[in-house]
Regions:
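The feature primarily captures lumenal catalytic ectodomains
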Residues: 1-159
């Protein structure tokens, strides 16, 4: 299992809480890796994603590396509040991966107070905001992901 960490935009503000919850509640034999891939070479990223069964990541370009994951793998995409553009879902479907989404809750940024329909609000005040994730929702999506990976990738039914 790979959990992507971001350090500029769409930072999960309670990332350490999320990691602790995932590590302490993980009852599977999946290896657990938390990583920021921005400084990794392209080759290192391909190698990392090729051996990833489950990816947990905030909405962003890092999810395009799913193209290197094997069919039957699973993606948990975490959306910032008010951002629902599911372009990576289409990619995941085409790659024969399974998918869960977690929509975070919160407020729009101050960029949206003056003109809520502006591009500044859409990008800076919505898509690129740092946010808190609902840890319970991620754990639920991960539980679903475990079952799907075991079934679709390894042909094993688990409950």
């Amino acid at each position: 299992m790979l959990v992507l960490n971001r350090d500029k935009k769409r930072v999960i503000l309670n990332f350490s809480v999320l990691l602790r919850a995932l590590k302490t509640n993980s009852t599977t034999s999946f290896t657990f890796i938390a990583k920021n891939i921005t400084s990794e070479s392209a080759v290192a990223q391909v190698q990392l994603f090729a051996k990833t069964d489950i990816l947990i990541a905030a909405h962003g370009a890092g999810i395009t590396n799913a193209m290197y994951m094997l069919p039957g793998s699973h993606i948990v995409e975490i959306f910032p509040p008010f951002w629902y553009f599911g372009c990576y879902r289409k990619l995941v479907d085409n790659l024969r991966l399974s998918y869960s989404k977690v929509i975070s809750h919160g407020e729009r940024g101050p960029e949206c107070k003056t003109d809520p329909k502006s591009m500044k609000c859409l990008i800076d005040g919505t898509r690129d905001r740092n946010f808190y994730v609902d840890v319970t929702a991620v754990k639920h999506a991960l539980k679903e992901g475990y079952s799907l990976v075991w079934k679709n990738k390894f042909g094993v039914s688990v409950q």
